[in-house]
Every structure is written in C-alpha cells, then in structure tokens.
Amino acid sequence: MTELGEIAPAFVDLAHRIVWCTVSTTDPAGRPRSRVLHPLWEWDGQDLTGWIVTSKTPIKQAHLAHSPYASCNYWAPTHDTCLAECAAEWVDDVATKTRLWELFKSTPAPLGYDPGAIGVPGWTGPESPSVSLLRLRPWRLRVLLGENLQNGFKATSWRA
C-alpha cells in the first residue's frame, strides 16, 4: 500500500487535469445516485481535502444524512482514472465559503471558474443561502494511468 504523501500529489494532478468527476452517494435504501460535479483538491503535504461548491438539495442532504460518504470517480479518454472515496460534510461558515469561492475564481480555467457566473439562481456570492460547500476527506485513493493499464500495471492505492 502506498503512503498518502506519495499518492496525493499524483491524485491531485490527475483530478485537476480531468476536472469533472462522477460523485456518488447512497440513499436511505442503499441505492446509489450519481451526479457530475467539479471538486477542487488541496494538498498541504499532510492532509488532502476536496471542496465542491454546490447546492444543498434535499436529495444530497438526505443521502449524506443517511451515509456521510461520497465516491469521486474521474475518467479521461486516455483511460487515465483516479478515485477518491471520502467522508463528506457540509461546511456552513461564511469565512470558509468565502475562501473557497475566491479560490475557485482565482484558479485558472478549466479547473477554476466564477461560481457566480454559471447561472445557478441565487448564487450571488459565498454568503448567499443557496450556496453550499461540501468538504471531502478521502479515506481511500486510487490512481491508474491509461498507459499503465495497457501495460498490465496495477493501480496505485492508499487507504487510511
């Protein structure tokens, strides 16, 4: 098993190159639900944290109340893949929401974007009640480059 310090930079690099991922949660009956979202990952050399600016919809709230976990699966046409299985929690404090809003705005495209300019009703700023922030704390990571898949190499994995 690989150490977090070895896999996290490779995961962040690949996730940020692919940008969009399928995020899956489960409902109270154990059925999966997926949606395509746009996390931004921060690696400080010790901790890896993912952030998603999103809406706190009734479905997302119910799923995370039932099971506070999410799976983030990235795929590129080259068959590069990476996966983060995470504890997921809502973050409501305005200071953190403001920091992440500005981070998304200041990060170069295609990873960065202006959350207030994408047309979601009510997304006028980080203090807006319709803007929610989801924090992801991985407990499992997996990275596999397409070229390694073709050569029969196994994925690099980490688990907390």
Predicted features by range, described:
Residues 1-18:
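N-terminal leader/targeting segments and the immediate start of mature chains
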Residues 2-3, 81-160:
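Charged, gly/pro-rich active-site loop segments
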Residues 13-30, 70-74:
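A short, Trp-centered hydrophobic/proline-enriched beta-strand micro-motif
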Residues 19, 48, 84-86:
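Structural detector for hydrophobic anchor residues on beta-strands
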Residues 22, 49-51, 142:
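General beta-strand recognition
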Residues 36-38:
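Conserved beta-strand in the GNAT
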Residues 40-79:
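A short mixed-secondary-structure module that forms the rim of ligand-binding clefts
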